[in-house]
Amino acid sequence: MAKVIGIDLGTTNSCVAVMDGKNAKVIENSEGARTTPSVVAFTDGGERLVGQPAKRQAVTNPEGTIFAVKRLIGRRFDDPMVEKDKALVPYKIVKGDNGDAWVEEAGKKYSPSQISAMILQKMKETAESYLGEKVEQAVITVPAYFNDAQRQATKDAGKIAGLEVLRIINEPTAAALAYGLDKKDGKTIAVYDLGGGTFDISVLEIGDGVFEVKSTNGDTFLGGEDFDMRLVGYFADEFKKEQGIDLKNDKLALQRLKEAAEKAKIELSSSQQTEINLPFITADQSGPKHLTMKLTRAKFESLVDDLVQRTIEPCKAALKDAGLKAGEIDEVVLVGGMTRMPKIQEVVQSFFGKDPHKGVNPDEVVAMGAAIQGGVLQGDVKDVLLLDVTPLSLGIETLGGVFTRLIERNTTIPTKKSQVFSTADDNQNAVTIRVFQGEREMANDNKLLAQFDLVGIPPAPRGVPQIEVTFDIDANGIVNVSAKDKGTGKEHQIRIQASGGLSDADIEKMVKDAEEHAAEDKKRREGVEARNQAEALIHSTEKSLTEYGDKISTEEKEQIETAISDLKSALDGTDPEEVTAKMQKLAEVSMKLGQAMYEASQAATANTETDTKSDDVVDADFEEISDKKK
């Protein structure tokens, strides 16, 4: 049976794991690393790079390098958070045809789901290379606080990448699975997950194979990227004070500052001070300018203190929803690379009143949990029951623009809930159902997921018709809604598609694009391999021609030289098939040369043997003389 892989699709890095016997195993990528940067780059030559190769060239290609796209997934272009991001990233964020935030590169628009699919394809290929077989099914993780639009967009990304997404699972829940799989005694744990772009806090009761989420809360626009950008702003401001030059308008300089910020942040987790040294960061009439400064851990902590404190309110809300006090939490599990920061650990310790558990790898534990869930769905992992919750309340807009909740936040999923509503006017023959997700009291302050009309209601006084609205949330946290006129039996049912999200036709087109691109990538790789083989063949043939050219006829020599020239011309072109054909031609005409080499080699071997025999005779004579002397 084909394996189900678990993928942690992260803002900064992604990770893939698979069940190996009873344990989840993280798979190394082609560069030998256990995590892959969630970065996609489009080069001037039309090549697409994913992961470490894309990240490596970011400084020289800032506008063509897309990173942290997870922060845009499932978001509208006019979302305030998108506005904030537009000012911080060097690549173009544009309005998609459906009103969502998309990215643009070299005049072509890509949805965040498409970019995410490219990263997922890389993870899929990593797993296939390790397993030696095709992978078609996956469990993909998302932040617990992702809304329906963001979950649906992530599922779409999986489909575009050629994966059947068996389950969308919350990141803290996945981490809890990996942490608690072998724990039999009952515990109440809090999973504090601060990653590259999002923050989640989940409270769970675990024990004897049951993982029950009691509550979850978070912030989908708070993570390591914000810490990096805070440092970038500080570096740029300090440089402006010293040199009078604003680096914020220079995309190349900004990319270098971002890399320096990320490096400084990591170094300050283990040391008290670090030095930022960026020579030739810019230039003016007086010549090149260099950026050199020292940064202490204390200064860094003061710069980001408000970001650290922003994680506390969700923690308070999650405990309140779970009906618990901080002291009733048995263990706090840290997840996400940012939790390596000493200040974060200090704040967590202070809030919960206990040292956090550090026995799991914060970069890998989520992918491992996803792999375990894949094993559960496949039947390989027995006696595990996972009870997750919906992070946000769901409801509809009712008279006066009020948000009427049908399903409260932190309700265990899957779940189904119905409620009967009526008309607001006499003889009203249609109703518009507007579906929202959020916690505000007025509908328009929440996230509009979808709207649809139920028509054909028989004329009647207001308040008489009975319209039954049913919400159904599946195990992925994805919503289906139906409205039914109980008088006529007329029903309208929809699967919520993110307002402005990708239609089935959009997804189908993107799947085709991805397949074509995979074919292009394969063709490009084959072209590179053919070029390498051709250059090696030219080199070896020219070398052999120099050494053994006098052993073949002039005509044969000319044929080989012509074939070499033709192959070199083919290498100047772009057709790998022509290169292959010219290689075969060169190999054919070089056969005589190979024969001459073989004959020369045989003759040399025969001479060597003769020399060896005469040497043996001399040795024998020497031995006999020695014997006589004795």
From Swiss-Prot:
The keyword RNA-binding does not apply. The keyword Repressor does not apply. It comes from the Bacteria. Pfam families: HSP70. Keywords: ATP-binding, Chaperone, Nucleotide-binding, Phosphoprotein, Stress response. Residues 515-529 have a biased composition (Basic and acidic residues). PROSITE patterns: HSP70_1 (PS00297), HSP70_2 (PS00329), HSP70_3 (PS01036). The modification Phosphothreonine is found at residue 198. One of its GO terms (molecular function) is ATP-dependent protein folding chaperone. CDD domains: ASKHA_NBD_HSP70_HSPA9. Gene3D superfamilies: 1.20.1270.10, 3.30.420.40, Actin, Chain A, domain 4, Substrate Binding Domain Of DNAk, Chain A, domain 1. Induction: By stress conditions e.g. heat shock. Residues 515-535, 600-630 are annotated as: Disordered. NCBIfam families: PRK00290.1 (NF001413), PRK05183.1 (NF003520), prok_dnaK (TIGR02350). Acts as a chaperone. PANTHER family: HEAT SHOCK PROTEIN 70KDA. This is Chaperone protein DnaK. It comes from Bartonella quintana (strain Toulouse) (Rochalimaea quintana). The gene is dnaK.
